[in-house]
Structure formats: structure tokens, C-alpha cells
Amino acid sequence: MTRLVLIDGNSLLHRAYHALPKTLTTSEGQVVNAVYGFTRMLLKVIKDLKPQYLAVAFDMKGPTFRHLEYEKYKEKRPEMDTELAAQLPVVKELLESFEIPVYEIQGFEGEDVIAALIAQSAKRKVQSQVQSSKLGGLETVVVTGDRDVLQLVDERTKVYAPLKGLSNPIMYDAAEVQKRYGLTPEQIVDYKALRGDPSDNIPGVPGVGEKTAVELLQKYGTLEEVFNHLDELPERQQKLLREYRKQAELSQKLATITTNAPVELDLDKCRVGDFRSKKAIEALKKLEFKSLVRELEGGEGLRSERPKQEEQEDAGQLELLEI
């Protein structure tokens, strides 16, 4: 099946920034640890997943529609480090040199943009580069470290997520989601409605922990059915769920990734090309990513070896990025 890979740019860049030391700089002192880690992971994704189409989605600065629903949404999340923020435009310039399209829309998170692109891709018929037959829709793989996106998993959509830093990625289909979390992809939203999500300041139901939320959904299936069977629950759970029902319903709304972001999937622009273009090589040279330049200029594809000098500079951290 023809494959479209959609990368959650903010998630990957954030992970790269925290996985690699800030001592990874250019000769002029420009910190490029996040850019380097992002680029390494990008090339690993291309090597491992072999997509025919590829795009990257980013958040945009400013409030989203979720902030309009709940002013305290993500209230406790600290501002992006200035050294990370400075690398965001650098990554976008690098993606442009690779001719990889970037999608971002004010008022929506990157996850919403990805969901909208997935919804559109499901309706497309594309010519397979491997087969001559027409295929209805695309297989889509979302690359992200954010487990919220697991709610998008279905028969045509998978999530490729690193377990630690940027290493040991797992390919989530519906069976893998069930195996690891005891829930179906469709239940992820209702789980967050009950449990909440401290990282996004989604309140959930106070007193309902991870174990209880999973048990309730395993027994009743959905948040609505949990409320339909309150009389069957222990008195304490009944009291909490009755008292915080509106808060749970708000949390459900906040946790739901929407598919209505106003973006348009352009498969022609997303088609994966040759990254050994002069423009791409020059962009890597400017950032002084010598090993990547050697790999691409040598025409040997995405090699697993890396220069010893760079390995030493990375202070033992780049084993997370070996490809």
C-alpha cells in the first residue's frame, strides 16, 4: 500500500532538544542539538518507513480553540526554551531545502492539522509506485512522541512513536494500543476525560486515577456508558462522577483531536524526492552536519556509521539516534 508519513514537528523537535546536549553547536556557537536530532530522526523515518509521501505539521504560537473552551488549558506548561525556539525556524528552512512541505494553521495544534490531513488522505485514490492498480486512500503513519495521537489509530492509520528520547520506536496499530494500554484507540479520549492530563492541564475527574479509568472503560466501553451505569459503581465513585460530570465532558472535548483544521493535502508537494539535491547539501553544510553531508554526497543512502569526532562531541547521547 502507498504510504503517507506525517511528522509531528513540535513533538520530535522537543524530544531531540532534550535528548541531546546543548554543547552540540556550530563553529560560530549556534546551538543546533534539536535541529541535528530532528534531522537524524527524519532520515531514520525515511529509511525505516520508506514513504512515498511525507509532510511535517507544527503548532503555531498563540491560543487555540481549546483555550477558548477552557482558559486554563496548558496553563502550567512552561514557555519554550529560547534556545529551542531559535531552532524552530532553522528546522523549517532545512525542511524547505529537502522539499518537504510544512503544514501549520493558527488556532489549531499540529495534531489537529495531522488529523485533518489523515481525513483527507482516506478519501484519495493514488497511483501506487509499486503496483499498477488504483488504491482507495493511503496508509498513513504519524510520527510523534505524544500518546494523545493514539486516538487516531485505525485500519489505515498507525503511530510510530519513540519510547525513550528518540530511540526504540514502536509502531502502534489498534492491537498494539490495546496491548500496551488495555484500551482501544477510540477509548483514549474517554480515558483522558476521566483521568485528565496534567501535561495539558486537562482536569478530568479528581480522585479517578489511571487504573480506575481503565477499569471503567474496559467494563462499560465509553464515558457515556459509564455515566449510564453510575448506580452500579461504589458510592465514592458515584459521588465523584456525579459531582464532576461537566468537567469530565469538558475534558473529553479538550482531549479530542479535531479533523476540521482548514488545510488542504497536496500529494504532489508531499511526494518524497531525492534529498541529495544541491540545495539540501548546502543547507547541511551551513549547519556543519559533516556526517550527514558525507552520507548524502556519497550517494550511499542513509548509513549507520557516524564520524568518531561527532560521537565524542555528543557526549554519549547520540546512541539514541543511530540509524
PLM regions and their residue ranges:
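Noncatalytic, basic helical substrate-engagement surface that gates or grips nucleic-acid strands
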Residues: 1-124, 136-140, 149-173, 246-250, ...
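Glycine-rich, charged/polar anion/phosphate-binding loops
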Residues: 41-42, 145, 238-240
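Non-catalytic nucleic-acid-binding/docking modules located in mid-to-C-terminal regions
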Residues: 50-52, 156, 169-323
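Ser/Thr-centric signal marking residues that sit
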Residues: 64, 144, 212
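Intrinsically disordered, low-complexity terminal tails and inter-domain linkers enriched
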Residues: 122-138, 299-312
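Conserved RecA-like ASCE P-loop NTPase motor core of nucleic-acid helicases/translocases
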Residues: 140-146, 288
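A generic "binding-loop/recognition-motif" signal
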Residues: 145-148, 198
